[in-house]
Amino acid sequence: MEYQELLHQRQSCRAYDPDRPVEQEKILRCLEAVRLSPSACNSQPYHLTACTGKLARQVAPLVQGEAHNDFASQVPCFVVISEAPYNPSAAMHARVTGRDYRSMDIGIAAAHLTLAAADQGLGSCLLGWFDEEKLRALLGLEGEVRLVMALGYACPGDPLREKVRPPLSQLADLIEES
């Protein structure tokens, strides 16, 4: 798939086919895309935990609540992104600049994961609503959970929605030096 087409095809999926598991090789390709993504000082300060089968069914209620993410019970795979330590160089840069590179790196990683999923015909949805304490206990994670991604095949007939975004002129400037 061409990159621009991929950008238009990727959307947050909230209707998954619960009877169609995600093949392990597709999950691994998504994780590999994250491994290859850029990060501050090449630190990759995160850990990915892919959950399928019974474990995915245990994760589902931990990302639901207060009328959020009702679709989670249909999701065949969740990827939990938690923090990992910086490498020494990135840690020093973060201290000196006061910038949270880890958050930036996790955002970059998540973007790569969603695009890799779309490239393989998978739907995805980034979830910021979750019970962190219970997720960490269930998965034995030491680092703070930052994002959970739903991953799976969209239900047949789930429409591709038109993207509603501000015009580029509101988001960007192109400054030319003469």
Tell what function each PLM region has:
Residues 78-92:
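Acidic-glycine-rich active-site phosphate/pyrophosphate-binding loop
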Residues 34-35, 79, 94-138:
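Small-aliphatic-rich amphipathic alpha-helix that forms the alpha element of a beta-alpha
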Residues 85-86, 130-133, 152-155:
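Acidic, glycine-rich active-site loops and adjacent beta-strand->loop/helix elements
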Residues 3-21, 147-178:
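C-terminal helix-cap and adjacent tail motif
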Residues 1-77, 84, 177-178:
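N-terminal amphipathic, basic helical "cap/leader" segment at the start of enzyme domains
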Residues 13-16, 88-101:
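Glycine/charged-rich beta-loop-alpha catalytic/anionic-binding loops adjacent to active sites
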Residues 68-78, 140-161:
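A glycine-rich helix N-cap at a beta->alpha junction
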Residues 43-46, 119-122, 146:
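Short secondary-structure junction motifs
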